[in-house]
Amino acid sequence: APAPSGGGSAPLAKIYPRGSHWAVGHLM
């Protein structure tokens, strides 16, 4: 999964390591 590079995606990567790309777009 393409993980977006950004400080806001750091905590999301811990919760959704395999879906951090949709998690960031989902919360934002």
Swiss-Prot record:
Entry's Gene Ontology cellular component terms: extracellular space; secretory granule lumen
Keyword field contains Secreted: yes
Name of the encoding gene: GRP
Modified-residue entries (Methionine amide), positions: 28
Protein name per UniProt: Gastrin-releasing peptide
Compartments it resides in: Secreted; Cytoplasmic vesicle, Secretory vesicle lumen
Pfam families in UniProt: Bombesin
InterPro entries: Bombesin
